[in-house]
C-alpha cells in the first residue's frame, strides 16, 4: 500500500505506485485538468512521475507560484520547438526561467530580426493550438548523447560534458518531434502555455564570456492566464513610458555614448538633480556622526591583494601601469577608508569611528549587462564605514536602519523589504567568524522589530549583509541600501585599536550605503516619479515666464529673488506664445510655472500654475516663496 498525505492532512491509499496525475484524478476531474506538477516530500516533480513510497504530496496548479515558473520554463522549450521548425539549421543552447519570464539562447549564423520574433511567436501559438502532450522520458546518459549527436546539437553535447560523471541518466522532454533535456518539471500539455508573449531579442555570449561566440537570446514572459498577462503588458508599457533613458533625453538630464561605455555625461539639469541628492545624503552623514573623507581613485595592486579583492574580485577591476608598477582603479571604497583609520593610534574609547565618502568607483561590467544609468561601469556611492567594537554592532546597525528608512521615505518609497544575504561559497574567514557576523545582523534587526528574509549564498566575500529592497510606483523591486558586518578586512589591512588592557585588537568594520550607486538611484528616482519629481527634488523647481517683452525685466527680478532664496529657477523670456511655454514646461514636469503679464508686474505678483494644470491664482512673490519653503520643509 502507498499512503499519500495531502496538505490538509487527509490521506489517500493506493494499492501500487501511483503518479501525481493519478492522485489528482482520484480527487476530482477538475483538479486533474488543472494539475501542472506535484511537490513530493518538498521536491517538485512532473505530473507523470510515479510515487512508489509513502509520501506527502501537494498538487501544483497555475494558481501556485511554482506552477507559473513551470509554465515559463515550458514556454522556453516551446520557443525551441518553434525555432527549430522555422530555422532547422540553428543550434539550441539553454532556456532558463528569469524574473517574470524566460529566455532561450540560440546559435544562429545570422541575427534574428523583429520579423523573425513575430514568426516564432505565431508558430508557438499554432503549436499550442494543437493541444499536444509534453512527454518526459528519463534516458541513460549515453543515449542522450546519441540523441543530440544525431540532431547536431553541439551545445547540448557540451553541456552534457560539463555534467558530473555521477549523472548517469537525465530527463528528455519531447514536444512532438522536438526534444530538449532538463531537470524539469514541465507542463503535461501545451494548453497551459496560452498566456505568453515574446518580448525582445538581444545578443549574448556562450558561457557569458565575450571571448566566445555570440548567441541570439529570445526573451519572453508567460503567466497563468490572459488576465495576468495583460496586466503585465500594461505594467511594461507604463515602465516604457517611465524609462529613465527616455525621460533623461526629454528633460536633458544626461546622455551616454559609444566612446565611453557605461560612463555618464551629466548635463546641467541632471547634475542639479545629482547635487540635490548628494547634499541631502551629505546632511545624513553629518547628522549621523560621519566624517566625510576623500580617497585616491587608483591604488597599487598590493593593497588589493592584502584586502582580498585581488583573489575574489579582480575580474571586475580595471588596471593601469606606471613606472613598472601596476595599479587598480578602485571598485570599492573600503580599503581606502582603512588607510585613513590607520593614520594614528586609536583607543577603544575612540570607537565607533565613522567615515563617509561619495566615492567614485569603476567596475568592469560586461558590455551586454550595461543598461542606461542603472548598470554602469563608473559610479559614485554614498559609501560609509564604521570601525567599532563587537558590543557596538547592534546599536550601529539599528541606527543605520532607522536612518535608511527615513531616507527612503523622504524620496517617496514606503514599501520596503529587508533581507539578509548570508555566506557565499567563495569567501574569506572561517565558519565561526561568519556565524558571529550573521548572528549580529539578525540580532540588530530583531531589536528593530522588523521581519526579514534570508538569502543563503548571497553575501559579499568578506561578510554577510542586510539588503533593503524598495518597491516602486509600478510594483518593481529595487535593491538599494546595504549594511555589512566585516571581521576580516581590518585584520588583513592592519587596522588596530588599543583595548582597556593596553592590548592591540582589530576593530569590527561595518560597510554601509543607503542609496548605493548615485547613478542607479537617480535612474530609479526618474522611473519611480516618471520624471515628475517632488518640488524639493526637481532639478528645476520653478520657471518664470513672461507674456510680452514688457515684463522681461520684472521676470528676471522674480527669478533673482527666488534664486537668492536657494530655489532652482529659470526664466523663459522667449518670443513665444504663453500657451506654448506652458505646454513645454508642463511636458518637462517642472513643478511650478509663474506667468507674468502687465497686471502681475504692476501688482508685484505672479500667476501660479502647477504641472498638473491646476491654477493656484495670483499671489505675491513672498507668498509663493512661503508656499515653496513649506513644501520643502514637509
UniProtKB/Swiss-Prot annotation:
Cofactor: how bound: Binds 1 zinc ion per subunit.
EC number, UniProt record: 6.1.1.3
Compartments in which it is found: Cytoplasm
Domain TGS: 1-61
Reactions catalysed according to its record: tRNA(Thr) + L-threonine + ATP = L-threonyl-tRNA(Thr) + AMP + diphosphate + H(+)
Binding site for Zn(2+): 334, 385, 511
Gene Ontology cellular-component annotations: cytosol
Cofactor(s) listed in the protein's UniProt record: Zn(2+)
Example of a GO MF term: ATP binding
Organism superkingdom: Bacteria
A Pfam match: TGS
SMART domains found in the cross-reference section: tRNA_SAD
Region (Catalytic): 243-534
Keywords, alphabetical: Aminoacyl-tRNA synthetase, ATP-binding, Cytoplasm, Ligase, Metal-binding, Nucleotide-binding, Protein biosynthesis, RNA-binding, tRNA-binding, Zinc
One Gene Ontology biological process: threonyl-tRNA aminoacylation
Subunit structure: Homodimer.
NCBIfam families for the chain: thrS
Job of this protein: Catalyzes the attachment of threonine to tRNA(Thr) in a two-step reaction: L-threonine is first activated by ATP to form Thr-AMP and then transferred to the acceptor end of tRNA(Thr). Also edits incorrectly charged L-seryl-tRNA(Thr).
Family in the record: Belongs to the class-II aminoacyl-tRNA synthetase family.
HAMAP family associated with the record: Thr_tRNA_synth
Protein name in UniProt: Threonine--tRNA ligase
Organism of derivation: Xanthomonas axonopodis pv. citri (strain 306)
Gene: thrS
